[in-house]
C-alpha cells in the first residue's frame, strides 16, 4: 500500500526489538498544521520462526519451559516443532490518541497495517475524525517478540486542510476484510434466517437470551458490525455485547443499525482488553480506558 503524493509525510521513525521484549513505546507528534486526512502506517518483520530458527536446542528449551511453567506434557518432537513454526508469533498492535482522546486501535495479526482516516473511509478499529490538529500519540503495543533484531517502521502522513481534493492510492484490501473473506459468515447468517427478520419469540419473562462476548472486523473477528447484528437478530437474542479487542469503534455503528432497523435488541457496550497478564472482558464500558488505569475509573 502506498500513499498518494499529495499526502505529506509528517513523521517517520524506525526501531529494533529483541526477543522477549514486552512493553509499550509511545511516539508523541506535534502536528504542525490542521489535517483532514491521516494515515498511520506501521510495519514489522519476523512475525514467525523460520525453519532454520527451530533448532533442537530451541525445541528443548521451549518444551522444558512449558513443562515447568504450565505443567504441560512432553510432546513428540516433530509435533512440537510444527507447533512452534505455525502457532508461535510475534504480536504487535498499534493505538492512536489525539489530544489524549482515543481514536483507534488495530488488533489484528498483520505485519503491515494502516490506520487510515479519510473523508469517506475509516479503518476498522478506528474512530472517524473531522480534522487532526494538536498532539498525536501513536503507541506501539508489544505483547511478544520471538526473534532478535525484529525491525519496525512507523510513518505518519496526512493531507493538510485546504489543499484541494485528493484521490489517495490506497489498496483498501490491506486494511479491511473483503467480501470474499466474509462469504462463509454471510452464508451462516442466511442459513440462520433467510429473511433476517427479528420475529418475537415467546420466552419466560425471567429468562433473557444474551451473547456477552462478540468480536467483529473492528478487531480480530470475521463479521462486520452489520453482519453480527443481523445474525443475532435472526437468532432472536434479547441483548448482546460488543467486546472487540482494545477498541470501542464498533459501538456507534451497531447503535445506528439497531435504530435504523428497529431491532428489539439491547446493546451492551464493552471491550476486551489485551494486557501483559492475560485478557480482561469489560462490560458497560462506553469510552476507551487504558487497561493499566482501569482502577482509576
Located regions from the model:
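A metal-dependent hydrolase metal-coordination microenvironment
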Residues: 201-297
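Acidic, Ser/Thr/Pro
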Residues: 1-210
Amino acid at each position: 500500500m502506498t500513499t498518494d503524493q499529495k499526502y505529506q509525510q509528517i513523521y517517520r521513525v524506525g526501531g529494533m526489538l529483541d526477543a522477549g521484549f514486552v512493553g509499550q513505546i509511545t511516539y508523541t507528534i506535534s502536528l504542525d498544521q490542521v489535517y483532514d486526512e491521516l494515515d498511520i502506517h506501521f510495519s514489522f518483520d519476523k512475525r514467525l520462526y523460520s525453519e532454520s530458527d527451530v533448532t533442537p536446542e530451541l525445541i528443548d528449551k521451549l518444551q522444558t519451559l512449558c513443562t515447568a511453567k504450565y505443567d504441560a506434557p512432553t510432546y513428540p518432537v516433530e509435533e512440537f516443532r510444527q507447533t512452534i513454526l505455525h502457532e508461535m508469533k510475534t504480536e504487535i498492535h498499534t493505538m492512536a490518541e489525539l489530544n489524549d482522546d482515543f481514536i483507534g486501535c488495530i488488533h489484528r495479526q498483520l505485519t503491515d497495517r494502516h490506520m487510515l482516516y479519510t473523508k469517506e473511509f475509516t479503518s476498522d478499529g478506528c474512530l472517524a475524525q473531522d480534522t487532526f490538529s494538536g498532539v498525536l500519540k501513536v503507541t506501539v503495543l508489544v505483547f511478544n517478540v520471538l526473534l532478535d533484531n525484529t525491525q519496525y517502521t512507523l510513518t505518519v502522513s496526512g493531507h493538510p486542510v485546504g489543499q484541494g481534493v485528493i484521490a489517495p492510492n490506497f489498496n483498501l484490501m490491506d486494511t479491511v476484510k473483503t467480501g470474499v473473506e466474509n462469504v462463509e459468515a454471510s452464508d451462516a447468517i442466511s442459513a440462520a434466517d433467510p429473511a433476517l427478520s427479528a420475529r418475537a419469540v415467546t420466552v419466560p419473562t425471567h429468562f433473557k437470551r444474551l451473547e456477552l462476548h462478540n468480536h467483529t472486523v473492528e478487531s480480530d473477528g470475521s463479521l462486520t458490525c452489520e453482519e453480527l447484528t443481523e445474525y443475532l437478530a435472526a437468532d432472536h437474542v434479547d441483548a448482546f455485547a460488543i467486546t472487540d479487542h482494545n477498541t470501542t469503534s464498533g459501538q456507534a455503528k451497531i447503535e445506528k443499525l439497531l435504530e435504523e432497523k428497529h431491532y428489539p435488541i439491547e446493546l451492551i457496550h464493552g471491550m476486551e482488553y489485551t494486557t501483559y497478564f492475560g485478557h480482561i472482558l469489560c462490560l458497560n464500558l462506553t469510552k476507551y480506558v487504558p487497561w493499566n488505569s482501569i482502577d482509576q475509573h
